């Protein structure tokens, strides 16, 4: 099982420490097949990092600290939405399967295993991208047709600004509580919530989609339960063709993708 941390607001000044603490926690609890985080910068752009190798290793890599406060004391984050993911692979130990999943200018992290009979032509080797596709299309019917179990967070652009979606089904674990930055934190465990400054106060309601437009302002929508039987994996896995799916490629300018390409390359070389 993967672990996720979702925050509607966070301490921009302490972003590097939050990332490093999450890395350490996930490594200690067995989510050591990949790591990633995504947030919005001060210019309103989507920024993200992924682990340079599928296995985390014992110490936080340099890129966990490389995007910290600059010489002027400014943070690269606007202190708003933040997603962090530690991966325990069920299939596909590769960087391509490491979260966040990116597409249509959006970013998603997910815990669980999902299937779909209607998105079988997605040509993806990662089930999380089925959720990304359904959410990017703003299609509740597609989301309702996904079976399995899931808890996810997704940052999505709109004409009015960024939105954060949070949801879980009736099986996956997702707890929540108010955090020290004036927003809310959601996490797989109480310890995950504490990393982003929150003490758990309740469990997230099942089959409900929360959509935040700010650190506290949000709407709720009910997600109908899927009614069809789970689809065999072979109907939606296509390892030979997944790169043809436009959801994975070209949606985010290269300059925004890896802010610290040199650090990532150095770290990957050092771990080989």
For each predicted feature, which ranges?
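Conserved short alpha-helical segments that host acidic/polar catalytic motifs at enzyme active sites
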Residues: 1-272
